[in-house]
Structure formats: C-alpha cells, structure tokens
C-alpha cells in the first residue's frame, strides 16, 4: 500500500464545519480551587456526563477524586467531600454510559472499584464502593466501558493483561493476554465487536475482545503509536505517536490491513502526548496536546485527502487532560457540537470549552445533529458474552435531553474473603509501590520471621521438658 504524505498547507473544501470555533466558558461558569492531581500518568484524570463532573485530586496517602454536580460552578471549598476509598493513587475514572450515577475507577492499589453517586452529589466523604474488583497483580492504568452492552467493563493493568468484568456477577469473565508490555490505550469500534490497543512494545493491535484473538498487528518503523481511536463505521483507525525523528505524528489506518498507514502527517516537534477525540456524528477529529493549550480539528472523509484541516483553537494555558461531554449533554440551541473540560493545573481550574457551528437561524439544525448514540443499552452482559453484536440504540437530540433513568445498578452480593495473620488481613494489604515501601515490608517480614523462630524454639524447649518429665514418671518406682 502506498503511503500518502500530506501537505502542511490547509486544504479548503466545501464543509459545513469549516467555521467551527471554540468558545471558553466565562469565569463564573468554570470550576475553581480544585487540587488537580500531579500524577504524570498519561490519562485525562477527568470524566463528565450531563449530571456530574469527576476530577482526580492530589492527596497524601491513598487516592481520591472529586464528584461535583455539573451546575455547581465557581469556587470549590477545600473540604468538599471526596470519593476516597482507594489505598493507592487513582489513575483513571470513567462514567457508566447507561447509568449516570455509576462511575468506575482504577488505581495503583491493583483494584477496580465501582461507585454509586447520589443525586445532588456527595454530602460527606465516600469510602465504601458498591463493588471492588481484584484480579490484576500490578497497578491498573486504564478502564473502558463497553459501548453497547451494559455492565461490561474492561481494565488494563501493568501486568500486561486486559480483564473483562461482568458487573452483574462482580467477577472477571475473560482475560486477554497477548500483550508483551504495558498497554497504553484501548478503543472500541461502534458496536464493540472490535478492540484496538496500543502498547509500549510499539505495536498496534486489533483484537476480537471476547476471545482475545489478534486479528491485525503491526509495528510500523516510521510511526511509534501511543494513542488509537476507531473512526466510527468507516473501518478506519486513527493513531497519534512520534516519528523516528521524535516529532509528533498522526496516521490513518485501514482496520483490515495494518501493514502500512493509509496516510500519515507530522504535526510539530513538541514532546507532549497527542490525545485524539473523534465525533462520529460530524466526522470531526480533534487533536489536543498534553502540556500545550491548542486544540486542532480536522474533518475525516472516506476519499482522499482523508484528513482535512479545519481550524485551531488556541489558548495560552497548558492542559493536563481533557474531559468530554457525551453528545446528549450538549446545548443544541447554541449549535454546540462538542464540549471539552480542560484541566489547568497552573490555576487549579477546570475550564469548559464549547465547539460551536455558527448559524443565524435559531431552529434545530438537523444537518449537524443526526441520530446519535443514546443512553439505552443494546445488550445485556450475558448476550454479549454469548457472541451477540448490536450497534448502539440511537436517539434524537431535537427535543433536548430528557432522560428517565430506568436502568439501575444492583451490586452482586459477594462473600467477603479474608486471610488474617497476626491481626493483619493479607488480602486487604496492597503491594508496595515504592522502594521505601518495599524495604519497610521486607523489614516487617524479617521481624515476623524472627518472632516465629523464637516461638518455635520456645515450643521445642517445652516439648523436650515435657518428654523428660514423662520419662521420669515412667522410670519412677510404683507405689506398692
């Protein structure tokens, strides 16, 4: 396949999205005084839906994140209640796409936890999860909900494994064990029948998620992939990464032939990771760099030139991560087609950015709001596990978003297991995360071994004394 080198010059074409612009929310509509995490893990540390905004925070000891009602803008008090049940730093959070009060989190403590947030937000710290999932042997860096099947959750750990959890029973039902290094990114196609992953071994893979079978795999020498996203139903993959000259790069792939990219383009020489965001309704692709404040956006087409540059949103404040509002949470009366929630660590602030199509008419714009993925699941967990594939249940945004939340989460009743030694529950103790913690654990174990040896020697001495007394009793003359 011939690789098409794209020109750096913007290619103008007739497009309804040519004049899309970014609009920053006013100061009173931002979220201030939030202690955003300083963790360097390459995640967004932010998740949003039409009811809540969740942000991973910086804490001493354990891990926590804030959950704020979306309308509660302005200054957030330092003692605002947190979700703080993890024993290690929280690395990723994701809202359930079908039950808006349910959020999943993963952490350095090797666990995945499911939380139920009450309507109106938290009134006190929440430390008890409705479900705790243990299966990884090392920290868990990524989680993703299945796009069409309810209560199916994927988690990727630093043990190089992907676990598939059925939350109806609270257990891992499948394991994908084809990666040879840390998994960097996971992305589903529209109906969730395919899973694309990028890995630290520099390979891009397309998998059948139920069996874990690798359908396509590539290690392109000219493009070291870091992030991947499926482009809707176009049978295309989009990746970002770096070239062999360490310049930031993007590439487009045929999902059925990963031997060479369909097209690739170098962006710039900055070092920050490029996060891709794709809107399947408008076929627009957004590129946001970690550590810089700009967001580039393109239009994707099935024919050449495939990627058409539209515009760039510029901002002086660098972003640590970006949350994205689901389509049913947008303001259609303002012709809003995408909304970011930008994490600005320098200001301890979350800044909403709306991408808007300028229109003079105030009527509903059906050409920019087609039927979109809705809030109803297409499949039950057992149906998907049996091999059934279904596309998302579509909804119209014409009447605005008025959801009656019929789906509820019922946590399975699981017997709590424990292994208590010297008053310490070994199953509750997390693996050491640092060299100092490892040394402390080593010295504790050495001290425990020393005590056990002392107890054994004392018992040996007692046994010998009892044996001697028994022998004396046997040898003593019997009373006549």
Swiss-Prot record:
InterPro entries: Coronin (IPR015505), DUF1899 (IPR015048), WD40/YVTN_repeat-like_dom_sf (IPR015943), WD40_repeat_CS (IPR019775), WD40_repeat_dom_sf (IPR036322), WD40_rpt (IPR001680). Residues 436-475 form a coiled coil. Keywords: Actin-binding, Coiled coil, Cytoplasm, Cytoskeleton, Repeat, WD repeat. One of its GO terms (molecular function) is actin binding. SMART domains: DUF1899 (SM01166), DUF1900 (SM01167), WD40 (SM00320). It is found in: Cytoplasm, Cytoskeleton. Its main location: cytoplasm. GO terms for cellular component: cytoplasm; cytoskeleton. Belongs to the WD repeat coronin family. This is Coronin-2B. It comes from Xenopus tropicalis (Western clawed frog).
């Amino acid at each position: 396949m011939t690789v098409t080198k794209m020109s750096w010059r913007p290619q103008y074409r007739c497009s309804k999205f040519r004049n899309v612009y970014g609009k920053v929310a006013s100061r009173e509509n931002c979220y201030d005084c939030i202690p955003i995490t300083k963790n360097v893990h390459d995640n967004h540390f932010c998740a949003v839906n039409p009811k809540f905004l969740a942000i991973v925070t910086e804490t001493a000891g354990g891990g926590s994140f804030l959950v704020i009602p979306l309308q509660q803008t302005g200054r957030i008090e330092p003692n605002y209640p947190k979700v703080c049940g993890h024993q290690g730093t929280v690395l990723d959070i994701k809202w359930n796409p079908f039950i808006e009060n349910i959020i999943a989190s993963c952490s350095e403590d090797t666990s995945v936890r499911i939380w139920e947030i009450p309507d109106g937000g938290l009134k006190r710290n929440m430390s008890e999860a409705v479900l705790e999932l243990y299966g990884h042997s090392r920290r868990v860096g990524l989680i993703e909900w299945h796009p069409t099947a309810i209560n199916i959750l994927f988690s990727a750990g630093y043990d190089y494994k992907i676990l598939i959890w059925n939350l109806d029973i609270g257990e891992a039902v499948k394991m994908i064990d084809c990666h040879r290094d840390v998994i960097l990114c996971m992305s589903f196609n529209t109906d969730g029948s395919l899973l694309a992953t990028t890995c630290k071994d520099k390979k891009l893979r397309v998998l059948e998620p139920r069996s874990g079978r690798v359908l396509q795999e590539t290690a392109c020498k000219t493009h070291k992939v870091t992030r991947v996203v499926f482009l809707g139903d176009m049978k295309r993959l989009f990746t970002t990464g770096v070239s062999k000259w360490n310049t930031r790069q993007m590439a487009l792939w045929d999902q059925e032939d990963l031997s060479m990219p369909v097209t690739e383009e170098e962006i710039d020489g900055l070092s920050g990771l490029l996060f891709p965001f794709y809107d399947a309704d408008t076929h627009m692709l957004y590129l946001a760099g970690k550590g810089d404040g700009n967001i580039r956006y393109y239009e994707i087409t099935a024919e050449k030139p495939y990627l058409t540059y539209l515009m760039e949103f510029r901002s002086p404040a660098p972003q640590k991560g970006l949350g994205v509002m689901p389509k049913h949470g947008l303001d259609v009366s303002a012709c809003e087609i995408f909304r970011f929630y930008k994490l600005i660590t320098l200001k301890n602030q979350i800044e909403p950015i709306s991408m808007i199509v300028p229109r003079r008419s105030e009527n509903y714009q059906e050409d920019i709001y087609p039927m979109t993925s809705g809030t109803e699941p297409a499949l039950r967990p057992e149906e998907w596990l049996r091999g059934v594939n279904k596309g998302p249940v579509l909804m119209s945004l014409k009447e605005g978003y008025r959801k009656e939340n019929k789906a509820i989460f019922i946590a399975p009743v699981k017997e709590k297991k424990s292994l208590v030694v010297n008053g310490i529950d070994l199953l509750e103790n997390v693996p050491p995360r640092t060299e100092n913690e490892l040394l402390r654990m080593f010295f504790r174990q050495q001290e425990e071994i020393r005590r056990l040896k002392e107890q054994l020697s004392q018992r040996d001495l007692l046994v010998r004394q009892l044996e001697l007394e028994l022998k004396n009793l046997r040898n003593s003359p019997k009373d006549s």
